[in-house]
């Protein structure tokens, strides 16, 4: 080969350029545009199978589940507002039903905006704040079913608390039910309504200063501390809800609370624990640390949150079906068609306005956290039971004047609940 090259040099330059240059690799290398193009192709080929969340299939499938759940739940909310005959119950029922639209739509928007900027933090904050609202609303709905604190205390006051490791009452051995127990249940759920919005605001602030990254358990990252506070707060709230159900499950039996209780706890617990599982998988390296989405680098924590949002989009359809059976509107429709309606019908707009107003939560928080907490009285207005109510106790409504029924006003049986003795406080 060396002899051939020497011969070509002596024979003349044109022959060298004609025969030697084509097979040599150096002239093919200096193409400037080839480098970046190949890099993009490689990134796309490597990232495409891993980034299912940004594909049209993932967004389409999640969208179908979300909009189906929205239609089903929207129709159920409308049915309750059309038969808004028990405001003090249905107000909380509708609040519970709104968990599906808020969870589903927020998760879908977070999935659509998955990328380098963690927009999902803002949507998840709204979703998580409503989670606290749901826990409180369910507990208060159970209070309304039973007629309030005074009516509950009339049934359980002085009874010993059964020790059970399954129900988490093993540490309450030798204690009996008192108003302090009910107050603890209320305070434990109300504290979550306060802690969660505060932690959501802190998360947004830390995110703005680049001090918050999902899945980053470093002591210098805000994620660790936000997660610890959130887990402690939600665990306390759910524990209080569980204790209340354990104490009143016999009283709540006519209202079929098991499906209601399991559905609400499944929605909250499932999203909570699957989020924790994804964070652990991300920490263990199962979820890759960095992916590329359209040239944008996405952290593993953001990717784990994307999987969480996709799962929630799918799960909300099944949640909407479960809530449809747990809180049917037919019970109140029968009451509407009875000869003696329990309360004057309200318009859909006024019923919706009453439902979304947080005024009752603020008042309840002030009352239960006040140092001057005293005997709690509650006046319940019970309607004369009409046909088609299935033997259930009539729900309580706002107390009306005790002047009887006259001038076209419907008859009401106003029962003043007894004062809870001060020694129970």
Curated annotation (Swiss-Prot):
GO terms for molecular function: heparin binding. Pfam families: Solute_trans_a. The keyword Cell membrane applies. Expressed in testis, pancreas, parotid salivary gland and mammary gland (at protein level). Residues 392-402 have a biased composition (Low complexity). GO terms for cellular component: cytoplasmic vesicle membrane; early endosome membrane; endosome; perinuclear region of cytoplasm; plasma membrane; secretory granule membrane; transport vesicle membrane. It is found in: Cell membrane; Cytoplasm, Perinuclear region; Cytoplasmic vesicle membrane; Early endosome membrane. The keyword Transmembrane helix applies. Its main location: membrane. One of its GO terms (biological process) is regulation of secretion. It is a multi-pass membrane protein. InterPro entries: Ostalpha/TMEM184C. Residues 375-425 are annotated as: Disordered. Keywords: Cell membrane, Cytoplasm, Cytoplasmic vesicle, Endosome, Membrane, Transmembrane, Transmembrane helix. The chain crosses the membrane at residues 51-71, 96-116, 133-153, 189-209, 226-246, 261-281, 303-323. Acts as a heparin receptor in vascular cells. May be involved in vesicle transport in exocrine cells and Sertoli cells. Belongs to the TMEM184 family. This is Transmembrane protein 184A. It comes from Mus musculus. The lineage of its organism: Eukaryota, Metazoa, Chordata, Craniata, Vertebrata.
């Amino acid at each position: 080969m060396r002899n051939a090259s020497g011969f070509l040099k002596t024979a003349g330059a044109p022959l060298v350029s004609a025969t030697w240059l084509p097979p040599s690799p150096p002239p093919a290398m200096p193409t400037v545009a080839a480098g970046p193009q190949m890099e993009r192709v490689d990134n796309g080929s490597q990232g495409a199978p891993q980034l299912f969340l940004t594909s049209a299939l993932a967004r389409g499938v999640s969208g179908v589940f979300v909009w189906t759940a929205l239609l089903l739940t929207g129709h159920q909310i409308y049915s309750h507002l059309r038969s808004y005959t028990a405001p003090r119950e249905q107000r909380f029922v509708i609040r519970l039903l709104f968990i599906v639209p808020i969870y589903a739509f927020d998760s879908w928007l977070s999935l659509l905006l998955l990328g380098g900027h963690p927009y999902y933090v803002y949507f998840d904050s709204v979703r998580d704040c409503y989670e606290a609202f749901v826990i409180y609303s369910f507990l208060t709905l159970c209070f309304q079913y039973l007629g309030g604190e005074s009516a509950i205390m009339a049934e359980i006051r002085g009874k010993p608390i059964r020790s059970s490791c399954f129900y988490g009452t093993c540490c309450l051995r030798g204690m009996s039910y008192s108003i302090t127990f009910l107050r603890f249940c209320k305070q434990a759920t109300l504290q979550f309504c306060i802690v969660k919005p505060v932690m959501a605001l802190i998360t947004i602030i830390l995110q703005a200063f680049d001090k918050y990254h999902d899945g980053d358990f470093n002591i210098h990252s805000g994620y660790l501390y936000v997660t610890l506070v959130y887990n402690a707060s939600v665990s306390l709230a759910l524990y209080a809800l569980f204790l209340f159900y354990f104490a009143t499950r016999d009283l709540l039996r006519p209202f079929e609370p098991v499906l209601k209780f399991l559905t609400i706890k499944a929605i909250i617990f499932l999203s909570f624990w699957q989020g924790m599982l994804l964070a652990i998988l991300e920490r263990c390296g199962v979820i890759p640390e960095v992916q590329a989405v359209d040239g944008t680098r996405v952290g593993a924590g953001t990717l784990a949150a994307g999987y969480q949002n996709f799962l929630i989009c799918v799960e909300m359809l099944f949640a909407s079906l479960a809530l449809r059976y747990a809180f049917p509107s037919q019970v109140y429709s029968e009451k509407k068609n009875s000869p003696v309606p329990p309360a004057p019908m309200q318009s859909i707009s006024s019923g919706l306005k009453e439902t979304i107003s947080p005024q009752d939560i603020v008042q309840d928080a002030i009352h239960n956290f006040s140092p001057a907490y005293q005997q709690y009285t509650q006046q319940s207005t019970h309607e004369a039971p009409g046909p088609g109510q299935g033997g259930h106790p009539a729900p309580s409504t706002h107390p009306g004047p005790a002047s009887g029924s006259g001038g076209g006003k419907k008859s009401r049986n106003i029962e003043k609940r007894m004062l809870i003795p001060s020694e129970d406080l």
